[in-house]
Amino acid sequence: MAAVQALPLSIDQNTEASGSQSHTNTRSPVTENTMGSVSSLISGRTYHDKQCRASEFSNKCRKPTNMPNCFKQQEGLLKTNYSSQDFLFNGLPTKKPSTTTSGNNGNYVYVNEDFKEEWHDARVPISPSSDAEDIREERSINGNIRGPPPKLIPISGKLEKNVEKTLIKPTAFKPVVPKKRNPSLQYLVQRNGGPGLSESQSSLNLLFNGNSAGIPEKHNSLSCRNIAHSGTMSDSGRTSLSSLPTSNTNCSHQLDSVSVSMGHINLDNHSNLNGYSDRASRGRTRPSNSDSGRSSSSKSTGSPILNDEILIRELEEKLKDREMELQQLKENLDENEAAICQVYEEKQKRCEQEMEELRQSCALKMKQAAQKAQRLQQVLQLQIFQLQQEKKKLQEDFSQLLQERELLEKRCASFEREQTEFGPRLEETKWEVCQKSGEISLLKQQLKDSQAELAQKSNEILLLRSQFREARCDLQISEEQVQELQDTAHTKTLEMEVCENELQRKKNEAELLREKVSKLDQEVASLREAAVASLRHGLCFCHEKEDPFLLYESDEAKAQRQNADNLQGLQQYVERLREALASERSRYQEQAEHFEDERRKWQEEKEKVIRYQKQLQHNYIQMYQQNRELERDIKQLTVELDAREFNEFDLHGAEIHFEEITATEI
């Protein structure tokens, strides 16, 4: 016996699932006489045909004639319940995960849309004869191997060295104590097998219940189905069920029949739930055939096809063996109806719970889809309204553009008529433009002359301004001189007042001196008279007594002589006073004459300054008036020049335009 590798298939959800499902249902009656699990490995057949044959084999495993009525009714209810939800699931636009079972642990996985037939992973299905360590080793090795499955050697048990690790080695069953079991199935095993189970039964029980530990009940049903298929088909390939002991084979077949019925119930339920689950689960059960079947199919797929008739004969023999096994399984199923009913009821409860969950999820998805559709409808209505508004606006714009087009056409026609009418007028205007151009040239010449005059006037204005500045400077200098003269005149008046005061004082002194002089004259006269008398009295004694008598003069003579000396001194003093008075008078007269001269000069200078100031003021007023007149003339000239330049610019542009017109006409 030789082992064969399983084909790993990546299955995604696609819209073609419903079509493929219906196609398998239509083709299933035609291929009832063939073995689906073996024929699916033959090259030259499509994946769709392989799936159809897998579904036929799963349908054959059941016993519809001997099944109780309760199973049929419950199965019909499940089918109708799940089929009623097909429209809901198929109508949703979202991506739906379809449930299928893995060949190792029975977990749910997502199904891919495109069926890629390439070999992504070299995976080996778990058989009851394989050990846990061998499985782990084979998984680690097969995870890194890619490509087509290795070729098998026709001799049983002899494999090539390079392929030895990638294939499942046929080994004997090892008794393994199961850890956790489903209560109903454990009851079946203990009741039928008892404590003395064979190696194949214990390994089947381990595979049947080992994967159910630590995962939901929903996954247990799928794992039971796959394990049942792999256990029954692979066991019959190596040794038929009839070769095992009766008690042990009965127990193992009972377990297989239970797992087969549960697998088909779950298969029917999930096939109605989603179009992909039936095909995926059937595709998963394909690798669980017998070793002999897999060896023949691997030969057919790995090597070129030798002869189709030989393969068909082999397949018919295998099919007969399977029918015998199925007959025995049906007999065992009749014996274990009560246990199967209990298991089926539990399965039905789980299915109802799943159905309720699916209904709730479906209602939620339908609600979300309805809300989404409502939002999309509102958005579309809003877009339609906006498009209608834009359409109305575009229609209005189009009508306005048509009206504008008509108006423009009318205006173009009127312009053409005016052009035909204005042709002769244009000629006249051209001649007038020529005349105006001559006038403009004259005006330009006049403008140049006026500009020259303006430049001359501006030079004169500059000269007048410079003269005005000089006159202003002279006026300031003369004003400063007048101010100085006024200051000097003021000082002179003060000096004259001082001199007048001094003169008055001198006059007063002179009056006092005159009075003194008159008094002194009187005293001198009295003294003269006394002196004359004394002289007359003393002459008589002069000759008689010359010197010696002088010594003996009397006091009266001494007094007289002293009075005479004093009188002489007074006379001299009076003479001196008279001389001083005369000098003072002469000096006073000279000062008065000098003051009069200065006064006359100051008056003359004052009159000159006044006349000069009056003349400067008159000149300043005249200059101011002239400046005002010049500024007025300059403003008028600037205004005239600006107007002429503007007119010249307009006429120059018009002249160029009309000259271009005449040139183009010529």
UniProtKB/Swiss-Prot annotation:
Negative regulator of katanin-mediated microtubule severing and release from the centrosome. Required for central spindle formation and the completion of cytokinesis. Negative regulator of the Wnt signaling pathway. Represses beta-catenin-mediated transcriptional activation by promoting the nuclear exclusion of beta-catenin. Belongs to the LZTS2 family. Keywords: Cell cycle, Cell division, Coiled coil, Cytoplasm, Cytoskeleton, Microtubule, Mitosis, Wnt signaling pathway. Its main location: cytoplasm. One of its GO terms (biological process) is mitotic cytokinesis. Residues 11-35, 227-238 have a biased composition (Polar residues). The keyword Cell cycle applies. Residues 305-647 form a coiled coil. It is found in: Cytoplasm; Cytoplasm, Cytoskeleton, Microtubule organizing center, Centrosome. Residues 1-35, 227-249, 266-307 are annotated as: Disordered. Residues 239-249, 286-304 have a biased composition (Low complexity). GO terms for cellular component: centrosome; cytoplasm; microtubule; midbody. This is Leucine zipper putative tumor suppressor 2 homolog. It comes from Xenopus laevis (African clawed frog). Pfam families: Fez1. The keyword Nucleus does not apply.
